[in-house]
A protein has these predicted regions:
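C-terminal end-of-chain micro-motif
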Residues: 1, 212-213
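Acidic/His-rich, divalent-metal-binding segments that scaffold phosphate/diphosphate chemistry
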Residues: 1-103
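Generic structural signal of hydrophobic/aromatic residues within well-ordered alpha-helices
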Residues: 7, 11, 24-25, 37, ...
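Charge-dense, low-complexity intrinsically disordered segments
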Residues: 55, 59, 107-110, 191
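Divalent metal-dependent catalytic cores for phosphoryl transfer on phosphate-bearing substrates
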Residues: 71-184
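Acidic, carboxylate-rich catalytic segments that either coordinate divalent cations
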Residues: 166-171, 182-211
Length: 213
């Protein structure tokens, strides 16, 4: 029987030490871990989950996740808690397989952030007894879409609740990696995404200070 906590330790080591953790996870994928052993099968589902070609030219959710993890590894020392940050990068789209739909030819995954919070808890609970760690990772997953919602003034924005549960800087850093971890990234696109992150921080701070949404 596989020692899940040992696998957790291996994952943790690669997430915190590798320059490109995706190489390790791609090896684990080829060896079948993500198709055979729960809860790792939750990651295997990402391979089968398509995304909008317009927003994700890199392809399925697994490809995107691997690109985000590598981006996160580049930025992890900027995080106040690299362990929580890197696990959130790995699990941030765990909710997409169950929320992805094709409507009128458009692929959507509404509320994958909310479901992702719950699935992150389910994923990590068999692997570690550190409940505060599990909760912290899950909350970062929960709020990783707020950059889009806040910058575009969407009704899903909820800055006050977000700031009660996570640090703004951590959400911004994860969002940056999420936005940059995509195919066909150009200098112009990267500059635009970084500007969006700055706007997110500024607008969130203004909302918090002014007592509005």
């Amino acid at each position: 029987m596989m020692d899940l906590k040992q696998v957790f330790g291996d994952f943790n080591q690669h997430l915190l030490q590798d320059e490109t953790p995706s190489r390790y996870f791609e090896t684990m994928l080829r060896q079948g871990l993500f198709y055979k052993v729960y809860p790792f099968t939750m990651l295997g589902e990402l391979v089968k989950t398509p995304q909008s070609v317009q927003h994700h030219p890199e392809g399925n959710v697994w490809n995107h996740t691997m690109m985000v993890v590598d981006r996160a590894a580049y930025h992890r020392e900027e995080s106040g808690n690299p362990g929580i940050f890197m696990w959130a990068a790995l699990l941030h789209d765990l909710g997409k397989p169950d929320t992805t739909q094709t409507r009128k030819g458009k692929i959507t995954s509404y509320d994958h952030d909310k479901l992702g919070e719950k699935l992150t808890v389910k994923f990590l609970t068999p692997l570690t007894e550190d409940k505060s760690f599990i909760e912290a990772v899950a909350k970062l997953v929960r709020w990783h879409m707020q950059t889009l919602f806040v910058v575009k003034d969407m009704p899903f924005a909820d800055v006050h609740t977000m700031l009660q549960q996570v640090k703004l800087e951590e959400v911004a850093l994860l969002s940056l990696c999420d936005r940059l971890g995509r195919g066909k990234m150009t200098v112009e696109k990267e500059t635009s995404e970084r500007e969006n992150i700055k706007q997110f921080i500024q607008k969130s701070q203004a909302i918090a200070n002014n007592g509005i949404r």
